[in-house]
Amino acid sequence: MSIHLIALSLGDAPIPTRLLALAPVDMIIIALYFAMVLGIGFYLKRYTKTGDDFFLAGREMTAWVAGLSFLAANLGALELMGWAAAAYQYGILATHWYWIGAIPAMLFLGIVMMPFYYISKTHSVPGYLKLRFGEPSRVLSAVSFGFMTVLMSGINMYSMALVMKVVLGWDINFSIWVSSITVAVYVCLGGLLSAIFNEVLQFVLIWMGALLISIIGLIETGGWSGMVARIHTNFPGGDYTHLWRTMGSFTDNPMGIHWTGIVLGLGAVISFGYWTTDFLVVQRVLAAKDLRAAKLAPIIGAGFKMMVPFIVILPGLLGLALLQPKLMGEAQAVATGGHSYNEVLPLMLARYCGPGLLGLGVTALIAGFMSGMAGNVSAFATVWTYDIYKALIRKDATDAHYVSMGRWCTILGVLVSIGTAYLVMQFLSIMDYVQALFSFFIAPLFGTVVLGMLWKRCSPAGGFWGLLAGTLSSIGMWAWVKLDPAALKYIALSSNARDMAENMYRALWSWIVCVLVTVAVSLVTKPKPESELINLVYGCTDIPGEGHLPMHQRPMFWAVVVGLCFVVLNVIFW
């Protein structure tokens, strides 16, 4: 079966407008994947009778299954397309979002925060806020989270459609509807249980498919040193291959960011906000069978997270070394008919994959997009059903009614996500869109949750007004810069800051606003009595000890191991 290429120019090979045509073996591989996904949904429908079954997979997942699902829920288009694009745009600096922007927060979730989430038996993060602060905080966070999840789901739809357009020449609208219908069917049937099993399957496929690009690309460039040499030749004016060395100035690195923005904005705020309060990922850990499994799951996920740059960031760096002409922002690409940063991964896929391998590679991408869509849609269904519908509209319905509502809400979430897919096209790259959303909703939420867990004096009024002030301040700062670009120097501390740097600093300021308002209001309003804080706050929760367990079975032991590996990697790529 022939592979059709229409030339533009791709370094030693051409960049085509229509990149590849599927051979029969490729179609068979993709069709088998779709059949397996739908089959899992139909099979697991029999095990989703109650609300706990549908929304939390019956709380029966082992640490390994919950841990891999915890990571796979985040290994969708945001990782595959978005961070490959970010690596092309910013170089190895994009790796910060996997290491300092993930590992410490995941370990903190497992060791410090998971006991409160799990012991309180909440269905969601907004559910925890209801128990800790009351109904107003729950509704505010639920509405914000529901809004964010459908916007995030749109990223996956847009990215999958982009791959089908670039790699296969398929119509973008057709691709969106095929993926949407498939996700709606299997999540409606099996709920979170179906989503988790498919996420583990998709995790394996993603690694099998995406790793091919990294291995073959390094062979072509002559290994890591050969790739670095080619990048320096293609981009002599910038340093794209060091993690920390160029972070002492806003102007010495491609991102236009100072190390304080990475350490404080990303490492201390956005990463902790996302990995400890975003219900999309926390929901997977809540499905663990016991507290030890729930604590181990994020730690297992952190171990794998450290390796993800080798299948996500590396293709973007290989694109810097190999692709010509240079890629550009989405708006410029649309205007000129060129290729954007967002297309670096499908371009690399087109460069290396023939029949069979192409089917595996495309299936890996489809798996990643559908994993991200399913994660957001299932989380949206849970938050809507428990934190909005049950809390405000129909409080005393049967369990079966809430399961039915969850299924209908899944369909609604998919339909709304289709509309949001087209919003992504207005941003320079996928990751600029994602990080803007995180700075709006995730950074302030982390301030509220962590104060609520660790400070008994934190009052219901303080939690609500702090969360609201943090969210509105972030949106306000974003609007200020859009209306007056000169304001960037006040938000990001430099007029040279790029979009990603602005997102980091905006997240930091919104978190500070949230914490200050929460503390100030709490000090002048009445806190809850300690009798109402049992299992919700440090000092009021009886957390089972682990002294009777062998060292290798203790979550803390593995957290230390992962933490040491994290430090070593940062030193190696300094």
Where are the regions that the model predicts?
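Membrane-embedded helix-loop-helix hairpins and adjacent transmembrane boundary segments
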Residues: 2-574
